[in-house]
C-alpha cells in the first residue's frame, strides 16, 4: 500500500533505472516528482537528464541540475584525505564519500520545494541505500523515504525494460542488453561491480578499466610533479595554484597517463555480505601518497601514530554512511587540528602504476638533519644517552623474563 506522498525529490541520473523509478513514483504514489541531478565530475553530459525528465512529464521548475564538483572536493574529499582514510587498508572510499552530499542536496531541495519525501535508486543489497537514508534522516528526521528497489516487483532487467516500453520511456540501444557490469563514477574515482566481476578468482577484463591505462602501457619515462599543501589540503601542482576540483582533475589526468590508481578487491559490505569491486582512483592515489609524505616531516610521532589509530574507525564511519554522525565530526575536529602545520611541498614520481615520494620540504619541518647525520654536528647526539633509555624501556621485559624463567625451572 503506497503511503500518502505529495511531493518527492528523486536522485536522478537520467539513466534507465532512475527513469523507470521516476515513472513508477508517478504511477504508484500519484505524487509530484522533483528530480535532482548532481554533477560530481562523473564525466557525463547532464543536459540529457533534463530532456529525459521533461519527456517524462517533469515541469522545468521541478528539474534541478547542479555542478557540485568544487563543493564535493573541498568539503568532502579533502577533509577525508586529511585523515589518510582507506577502508580495509585499500579502498579510498570514492563512492561512499559522494553519497552524503547528494543526500544533503536532496533535503535542501525538499525544504525549498515543500516536498515531504525523497527517493533514491540504490538496490536492497548494497551499501548505498544505507548511506543515502542515514543522510536523509540525520538532516530531516521526519522525512519519508521511498526506496523503490525494496518495494516494487521489477526484479529483473526484462521487467524493467517491459515497464519502460509500457510507459514510453526511451531506451538507448546499448541499454537493451544486460550490462556486463555496473559503474559508478565521480571526480574521485570510478567503481565497477557485478556480472563479469562477480567471480573473485577471475581477472577483471581490461575493458572494465575506463580511467587508467594499464601500467604495462604507461610511458617508459617517469613523470615528476610537485604538490603544494596548505594546512593539509593540496593547493597547487608544479607551482600553479588550482581550485580543489581543478587540482583533482589534473591529478586524475596525470594518474591516468601513468597507469596509477587501479584496485581490485573483495570488501566487507555494511549489510553483511562480501563483494568484489574494481576501482580506479588515479588522482586520489597520488594525493594520498603526497599527503602522507608532507605529514612525515610535519607531524610529531605521537600525533602521527594517533592519527593512524583513528583512521580505520573514521574510514569505517564514512563507508557505513555515518558522515553526519557526531562521532565522525569529533574525529574530524581532531584530524583537522593535526593539520595546522601540514604545509609545504612534496615531489612525487609517477611511473608505470607506482607513486613514489622522492622529496618533501616544509617551513614547519620537524626533521633535523644535524640530529640524524652520522657526522659530528653542532647539535651532537650523545650515543651514551641511549643506554639509559634502553635500560628503562627494558625493565618490564626483564621482569617478565625473570618470571618466565622461574616458572620453567
Swiss-Prot record:
It comes from the Bacteria. Its main location: cytoplasm. One of its GO terms (cellular component) is cytoplasm. It catalyses: L-citrulline + L-aspartate + ATP = 2-(N(omega)-L-arginino)succinate + AMP + diphosphate + H(+). GO terms for molecular function: argininosuccinate synthase activity; ATP binding. PROSITE patterns: ARGININOSUCCIN_SYN_1, ARGININOSUCCIN_SYN_2. GO terms for biological process: argininosuccinate metabolic process; L-arginine biosynthetic process; urea cycle. Pathway: Amino-acid biosynthesis; L-arginine biosynthesis; L-arginine from L-ornithine and carbamoyl phosphate: step 2/3. The keyword ATP-binding applies. It is an enzyme of class 6 (ligase). L-aspartate binds at residues 123, 127-128. ATP binds at residues 11-19, 38, 121. Pfam families: Arginosuc_syn_C (PF20979), Arginosuc_synth (PF00764). L-citrulline binds at residues 91, 96, 127, 131, 182, 191, 267, 279. Keywords: Amino-acid biosynthesis, Arginine biosynthesis, ATP-binding, Cytoplasm, Ligase, Nucleotide-binding. It is found in: Cytoplasm. InterPro entries: Arginosuc_syn_C (IPR048268), Arginosuc_syn_N (IPR048267), Arginosuc_synth (IPR001518), Arginosuc_synth_CS (IPR018223), Arginosuc_synth_type_1_subfam (IPR023434), AS_cat/multimer_dom_body (IPR024074), Rossmann-like_a/b/a_fold (IPR014729). Its EC number is 6.3.4.5. Belongs to the argininosuccinate synthase family. Type 1 subfamily. Homotetramer. NCBIfam families: argG, PRK00509.1. PANTHER family: ARGININOSUCCINATE SYNTHASE (PTHR11587:SF2). This is Argininosuccinate synthase. The gene is argG.
Amino acid at each position: 500500500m503506497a503511503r500518502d506522498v505529495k511531493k518527492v525529490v528523486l536522485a536522478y541520473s537520467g539513466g534507465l533505472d532512475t527513469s523507470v523509478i521516476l515513472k513508477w513514483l508517478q504511477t504508484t504514489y500519484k505524487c509530484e516528482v522533483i528530480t535532482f541531478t548532481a554533477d560530481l565530475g562523473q564525466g557525463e553530459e547532464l543536459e540529457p537528464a533534463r530532456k529525459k525528465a521533461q519527456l517524462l512529464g517533469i515541469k522545468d521548475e521541478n528539474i534541478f541540475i547542479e555542478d557540485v564538483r568544487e563543493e564535493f572536493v573541498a568539503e568532502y574529499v579533502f577533509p577525508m584525505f586529511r585523515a589518510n582514510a582507506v577502508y580495509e587498508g585499500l579502498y579510498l572510499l570514492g563512492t561512499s564519500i559522494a553519497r552524503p552530499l547528494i543526500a544533503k542536496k536532496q533535503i535542501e531541495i525538499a525544504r525549498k520545494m515543500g516536498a515531504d519525501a525523497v527517493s533514491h535508486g540504490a538496490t536492497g543489497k548494497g551499501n548505498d541505500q544505507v548511506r543515502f537514508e542515514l543522510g536523509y534522516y540525520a538532516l530531516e528526521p521526519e522525512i519519508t523515504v521511498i526506496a523503490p528497489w525494496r518495494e516494487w516487483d521489477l526484479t529483473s532487467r526484462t521487467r524493467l525494460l517491459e515497464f519502460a516500453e509500457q510507459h514510453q520511456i526511451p531506451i538507448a540501444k546499448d541499454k537493451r542488453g544486460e550490462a556486463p557490469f555496473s559503474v559508478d563514477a565521480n571526480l574521485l574515482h570510478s567503481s565497477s561491480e557485478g556480472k563479469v566481476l562477480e567471480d573473485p578468482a577471475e581477472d577483471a577484463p581490461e575493458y572494465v578499466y575506463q580511467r587508467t591505462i594499464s601500467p604495462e602501457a604507461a610511458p617508459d619515462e617517469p613523470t615528476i610533479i610537485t604538490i603544494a599543501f596548505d594546512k593539509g589540503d593540496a593547493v597547487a601542482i608544479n607551482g600553479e595554484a588550482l581550485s580543489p576540483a581543478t587540482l583533482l582533475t589534473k591529478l586524475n589526468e596525470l594518474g591516468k597517463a601513468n597507469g596509477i590508481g587501479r584496485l581490485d578487491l573483495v570488501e566487507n559490505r555494511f549489510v553483511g555480505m562480501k563483494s568484489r569491486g574494481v576501482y580506479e582512483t588515479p588522482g586520489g592515489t597520488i594525493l594520498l601518497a603526497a599527503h602522507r609524505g608532507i605529514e612525515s616531516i610535519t607531524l610529531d610521532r605521537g600525533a602521527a601514530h594517533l592519527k593512524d589509530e583513528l583512521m580505520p574507525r573514521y574510514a569505517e564511519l564514512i563507508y557505513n554512511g555515518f558522515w553526519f554522525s557526531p562521532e565522525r565530526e569529533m574525529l574530524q575536529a581532531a584530524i583537522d587540528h593535526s593539520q595546522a602545520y601540514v604545509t609545504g611541498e612534496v615531489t612525487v614520481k609517477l611511473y608505470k602504476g607506482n607513486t613514489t615520494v622522492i622529496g618533501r620540504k616544509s617551513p614547519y619541518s620537524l626533521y633535523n638533519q644535524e640530529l640524524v647525520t652520522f657526522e659530528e654536528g653542532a647539535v651532537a647526539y650523545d650515543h651514551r644517552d641511549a643506554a639509559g633509555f634502553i635500560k628503562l624501556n627494558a625493565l618490564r621485559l626483564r621482569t617478565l623474563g625473570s618470571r618466565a624463567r622461574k616458572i620453567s625451572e
